C-alpha cells in the first residue's frame, strides 16, 4: 500500500474523481426489472449561476438518489432547465440596454437563447463539481422543440377538453414587463404611501373619501358606503361628482366597505384591487380603463393622459391641493402587490387573455393522496387553493416562451387552435394548413406566448415518458422543491397532471427551506451576506458543503449558512482521513473469531445502520448524518481504536486478526453509509480499501451482535482514561495493577494495553477499608471568623491525628484555642486500603475497579 498523506487533500481527491467517474452509471434503464424511483427534479431558471439555495436542494435530491440506488432501485435523477419567461428576458434587456419592442422578435429570442445556453453550461459545471449524480441522459431544455412540443400538445388537449378558454377579464399586469402575470406570481411588500382625504361634491352635500390611488380618479365608476354606517347612508342611491374630472357616479351600499378605514367611504375604480373587481361584477358597473399596458394614463384622464402612473399621481395631487379638494394627508403602511421578477407595483387591467380553468376540489383531493414531507406543508397548498377566485391566466405578452399555437381568422375573427399533429410550430412563422370554417385562408397569428409555468408544470409527465414512450411510468416517485413555489410549481403540476392523464404527478413531495445568510437574513449581495458554491469548493471542498446541507436542518425548515459549520465539516473529514490512515495498514477482509469488544463495536455499528436507514426513509438527513458523525468520532475513534491499539501493534494472533477484520468491516459499512452524503472522500477510502467503487455497492445490512462484556470493557477503558486524565497522567502512563470485580467473564488483553498495567479479574465485591490520613483546614471559613487566631488554629489542626479530628467532628464539637471548629471548616483527607495497601476505587454499574498506582 502506498503511503497515505497525513493531511486530507480535498482538492486533489475531488478533482480526481470528477475526472474518473463514469456518468453512465447513473442512467435510468427503461428496460430494468428493478423497482423504479423517478425524481421530478426542479428545472432552475438558467439566468445566472447555480446559487447556494440550489446547492441545498440538489444535495437533498442527491442524498435520496444515491441512497435509493444502493437500496436496489432503478433511479432517474434527471436535470431540466426552465428556460422561458421573464427572468431571461429581463436579463437580456438589462445586459443589452434594450426592450423587447426595440429589436425584431427573432433577434430578441436569439439573444435570450444564447444567454440561456451560456448559463446552462455554467450551472452544469457547478452541479458536476458538487458531486451530484445526475442522469444526464434524461436532461431536458424547455426552449428546445422536443420539449415545448409537449407544452403545446398539452395546451391543445386541455383546450379540446374545455379546460382552456380565451376571454376579456381583469388580470394582474406588470407595466414594466408589459405582460399579464398570474396571482401566484404576485409578491407582496409593505410600503409607506399617502392617504389623501378629498371631497366628492353633489347637490345633496359633499361626501368625504380617503384614497391612496388618486391617479385612479378617472377610472372611478362608483362610490360605496357600509349599509350600517349611519353617517353616510343618506347618500345611497344618489350621485356624486368625481373631482377634477367632473362626471357623476352613483353611491352604493355594500357590507364589504370598512367603516373604520379613512372616512368610511371608498371609491370603486376599474381597477385598484381585487375588491374593486368583486364590486364591479356584483353591481354590474361600467368599465373605465385609465391605465394602459405600458403603465401610462389613457385619454379618459384628459390632460393627464400619456403620463406615467408616478407622474400622474403627483400632478393630480398637486392640482387637487392647490384647489383645496384634498384637505388632509397622512402616511399609511400598505401591503403592495409587486411583479415577482422586477418588483414593479402591479395594476389590474381588463384584457383579453387565455385562461386555464381551476378545479380547487380536484387539486385538494389529489394533494391528500400525496405524501408531504414535512406534512404541514400541505396546508400551504390547501390554503392557497382555497383562496383562488380567478382562473389561471396563461398568456403572456412577451417573446421568449412557448408560442400559443393559435390564429385568428381575418374575415370572421374565429379562433383556430392547432391540431396536435401540426406541432411544434410558431404561429408567427407558420399558417394553418386548413381554411377557416368561413372559407377564408387569411389569419392573424397569436403573438402572445405561454406562461413559463405551462412548461415546467408538465415536468413530472415529461420525465415519466408522457407522449414520448408507449410505456409511460407516471406517477413519479418524488418531487423535491422549495416551499416558496408550492403555490406555483406544485399547484400547477397537480392541476395539469390531473387534467391531462388523471393521475397524481408524484407519490411524495419533499419540501426544502430557503438559505439564509450568517446574519439570519435572506441571502443578498446588497446585504453582503451572499456566498456562492464555488467559494466553498475553493476553501473547503464539495463534501464540506454537502455536510452543511445534510446537517443544516430537517426538510421544510430554512437553513442558515455558517462558515463555522463548513470548517467543522472539514475537521470531520480530516478525522475520518486520520482514522483511515491509521486503520489502512491493519484492516483486512479476513476470518477470525471476534472478541468481546469487537462484537460490541459491530453491535453499535448495526444500530447505526438501522438508525441511519430509518432516518433516510423519512428524509431526515440531519439525523442520519449526525448519527454517523457521532459514531465515527466517539465510538470508533475515541473508544474502539484506542482500546485495540495494543492488539493491532502486537504479534500475529487470532485476536489481532479479529481487530483487523473488525476495522475492515466497519470502514466498509461506514463508507457505504456516508456515500450519499460525502461521495468524494468515501470513494477515495473505499476504492483504496476494496478496489471497488462505493457508489456501485448495496446499502449495508448487518447481522445482530450483542456483547454486554464488550460494553463493560468500553466502560472500564473510558473510566481508566478519565482517571489518568483527571490526575494529569499521560494516557500511556503505567500503573502497578488493576483489580476488576465483576460477575461478567471479561477478556482482559485490550484492557492491559489501555491501562498499561497487569489486570486481575475477580468475582464478588472487594474488601476495602477507608482511613483518615490528613486534615485540611478550610481557610475561607476559618479566616473571616477568627482573623488573628486563624494561624494558631490551622497549625493546631494540622498537628492533630486526623482520626481524632474526625471523631470529634462526628460527636458534634471541636474546640481549639477557645475557638469552636464546625464541620465546614475542616476537610478530612481519606485513603482507601485493600489488604493493607493504598488503592483508588472506581465504581461502575457492573464493576468495581481497584487501582494501584506505580510507586
Curated annotation (Swiss-Prot):
Statement: the UniProt record of this protein carries the keyword Protein biosynthesis: yes
Motif ('KMSKS' region): 522-526
PROSITE patterns: AA_TRNA_LIGASE_I
Listed CDD domains: Anticodon_Ia_Val, ValRS_core
Domain of life of the organism encoding this protein: Archaea
Annotated disulfide bonds: none
Organism of this sequence: Methanothrix thermoacetophila (strain DSM 6194 / JCM 14653 / NBRC 101360 / PT)
EC number(s) reported in the record: 6.1.1.9
Motif ('HIGH' region): 44-54
Protein name, as recorded: Valine--tRNA ligase
InterPro entries: aa-tRNA-synth_I_CS, aa-tRNA-synth_Ia, Anticodon_Ia_Val, M/V/L/I-tRNA-synth_anticd-bd, Rossmann-like_a/b/a_fold, tRNAsynth_Ia_anticodon-bd, Val/Leu/Ile-tRNA-synth_edit, Valine-tRNA_ligase_type_2
The keyword Cytoplasm belongs to this UniProt entry's keyword annotation: yes
Amino acid at each position: 500500500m502506498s503511503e497515505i498523506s497525513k493531511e486530507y487533500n480535498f482538492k486533489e481527491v475531488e478533482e480526481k474523481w470528477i475526472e474518473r467517474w463514469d456518468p453512465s452509471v447513473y442512467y435510468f434503464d427503461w428496460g430494468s426489472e428493478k423497482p423504479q424511483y423517478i425524481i421530478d427534479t426542479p428545472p432552475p431558471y438558467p439566468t445566472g449561476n447555480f446559487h447556494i439555495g440550489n446547492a441545498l436542494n440538489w444535495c437533498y435530491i442527491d442524498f435520496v438518489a444515491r441512497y435509493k440506488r444502493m437500496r436496489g432501485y432503478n433511479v432517474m435523477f434527471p436535470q431540466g432547465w426552465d428556460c422561458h419567461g421573464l427572468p431571461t428576458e429581463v436579463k437580456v434587456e438589462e445586459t443589452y440596454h434594450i426592450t423587447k419592442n426595440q429589436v425584431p422578435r427573432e433577434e430578441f429570442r436569439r439573444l435570450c437563447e444564447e444567454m440561456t445556453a451560456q448559463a446552462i453550461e455554467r450551472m452544469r459545471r457547478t452541479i458536476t463539481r458538487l458531486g451530484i449524480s445526475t442522469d444526464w441522459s434524461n436532461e431536458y431544455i424547455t426552449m428546445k422543440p422536443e420539449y415545448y412540443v409537449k407544452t403545446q400538445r398539452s395546451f391543445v388537449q386541455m383546450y379540446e377538453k374545455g379546460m382552456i378558454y380565451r376571454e376579456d377579464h381583469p388580470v394582474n399586469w406588470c407595466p414594466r414587463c408589459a405582460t399579464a402575470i398570474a396571482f401566484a406570481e404576485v409578491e407582496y411588500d409593505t410600503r409607506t404611501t399617502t392617504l389623501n382625504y378629498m371631497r366628492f361634491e353633489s347637490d345633496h352635500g359633499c361626501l368625504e373619501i380617503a384614497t391612496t390611488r388618486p391617479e385612479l380618479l378617472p377610472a372611478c365608476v362608483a362610490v360605496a358606503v357600509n349599509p350600517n354606517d349611519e353617517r353616510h347612508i343618506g347618500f345611497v342611491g344618489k350621485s356624486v361628482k368625481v373631482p377634477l374630472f367632473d362626471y357623476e357616479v352613483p353611491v352604493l351600499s355594500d357590507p364589504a366597505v370598512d367603516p373604520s378605514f379613512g372616512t368610511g367611504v371608498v371609491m370603486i375604480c376599474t381597477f385598484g384591487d381585487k375588491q374593486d373587481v368583486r364590486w364591479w361584477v356584483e353591481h354590474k358597473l361600467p368599465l373605465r380603463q385609465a391605465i394602459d399596458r405600458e403603465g401610462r394614463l389613457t385619454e379618459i384622464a384628459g390632460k393627464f393622459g400619456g403620463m406615467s402612473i408616478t407622474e400622474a399621481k403627483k400632478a393630480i395631487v398637486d392640482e387637487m391641493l392647490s384647489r383645496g379638494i384634498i384637505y388632509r394627508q397622512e402616511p399609511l403602511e400598505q401591503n403592495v402587490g409587486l411583479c415577482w421578477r422586477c418588483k414593479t407595483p402591479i395594476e389590474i387591467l381588463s384584457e383579453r387573455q387565455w385562461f386555464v380553468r381551476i378545479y380547487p376540489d380536484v387539486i385538494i383531493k389529489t394533494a391528500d393522496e400525496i405524501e408531504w414531507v414535512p406534512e404541514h406543508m400541505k396546508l400551504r397548498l390547501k390554503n392557497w387553493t382555497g383562496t383562488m377566485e380567478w382562473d389561471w391566466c396563461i398568456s403572456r405578452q412577451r417573446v421568449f416562451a412557448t408560442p400559443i399555437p393559435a390564429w385568428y381568422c381575418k374575415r370572421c375573427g374565429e379562433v383556430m387552435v392547432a391540431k396536435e399533429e401540426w406541432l411544434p410550430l410558431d404561429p408567427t412563422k407558420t399558417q394553418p394548413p386548413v381554411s377557416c370554417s368561413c372559407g377564408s385562408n387569411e389569419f392573424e397569428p397569436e403573438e402572445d406566448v405561454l406562461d413559463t409555468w405551462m412548461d415546467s408544470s408538465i415536468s413530472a409527465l415529461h420525465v415519466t415518458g408522457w407522449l414520448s414512450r408507449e410505456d409511460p411510468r407516471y406517477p413519479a416517485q418524488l418531487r423535491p422543491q422549495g416551499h416558496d413555489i408550492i403555490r406555483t410549481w406544485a399547484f400547477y403540476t397537480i392541476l395539469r397532471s390531473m387534467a391531462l392523464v388523471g393521475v397524481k404527478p408524484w407519490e411524495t413531495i419533499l419540501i426544502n427551506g430557503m438559505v439564509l445568510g450568517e446574519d439570519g437574513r435572506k441571502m443578498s449581495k446588497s446585504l453582503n451576506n451572499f456566498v456562492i458554491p464555488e467559494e466553498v469548493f475553493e476553501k473547503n471542498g464539495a463534501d464540506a458543503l454537502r455536510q452543511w446541507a445534510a446537517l443544516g436542518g430537517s426538510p421544510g425548515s430554512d437553513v442558515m449558512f455558517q462558515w463555522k459549520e463548513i470548517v467543522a465539516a472539514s475537521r470531520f473529514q480530516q478525522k475520518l482521513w486520520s482514522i483511515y490512515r491509521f486503520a489502512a495498514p491493519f484492516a483486512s477482509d479476513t476470518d477470525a473469531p471476534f472478541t468481546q469488544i469487537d462484537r460490541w463495536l459491530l453491535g453499535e455499528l448495526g444500530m447505526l445502520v438501522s438508525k441511519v436507514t430509518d432516518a433516510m426513509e423519512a428524509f431526515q438527513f440531519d439525523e442520519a448524518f449526525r448519527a454517523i458523525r457521532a459514531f465515527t468520532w466517539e465510538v470508533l475513534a475515541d473508544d474502539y481504536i484506542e482500546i485495540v491499539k495494543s492488539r493491532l501493534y502486537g504479534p500475529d494472533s487470532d485476536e489481532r486478526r479479529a481487530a483487523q477484520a473488525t476495522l475492515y468491516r466497519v470502514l466498509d459499512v461506514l463508507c457505504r453509509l456516508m456515500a450519499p452524503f460525502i461521495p468524494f472522500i468515501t470513494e477515495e477510502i473505499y476504492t483504496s480499501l476494496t478496489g471497488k467503487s462505493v457508489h456501485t455497492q448495496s446499502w449495508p445490512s448487518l447481522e445482530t451482535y450483542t456483547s454486554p462484556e464488550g460494553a463493560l470493557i468500553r466502560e472500564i477503558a473510558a473510566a481508566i482514561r478519565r482517571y489518568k486524565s483527571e490526575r494529569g497522567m499521560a494516557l500511556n502512563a503505567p500503573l502497578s495493577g488493576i483489580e476488576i470485580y465483576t460477575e461478567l467473564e471479561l477478556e482482559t488483553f485490550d484492557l492491559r494495553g489501555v491501562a498499561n498495567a497487569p489486570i486481575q479479574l475477580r468475582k464478588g465485591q472487594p474488601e476495602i477499608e477507608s482511613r483518615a490520613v490528613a486534615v485540611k483546614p478550610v481557610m475561607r471559613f476559618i479566616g473571616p471568623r477568627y482573623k488573628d487566631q486563624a494561624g494558631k488554629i490551622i497549625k493546631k489542626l494540622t498537628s492533630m491525628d486526623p482520626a481524632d479530628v474526625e471523631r470529634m467532628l462526628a460527636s458534634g464539637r471541636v474546640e481549639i484555642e477557645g475557638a469552636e471548629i464546625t464541620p465546614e471548616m475542616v476537610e478530612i483527607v481519606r485513603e482507601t486500603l485493600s489488604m493493607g495497601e493504598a488503592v483508588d476505587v472506581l465504581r461502575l454499574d457492573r464493576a468495581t475497579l481497584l487501582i494501584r498506582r506505580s510507586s
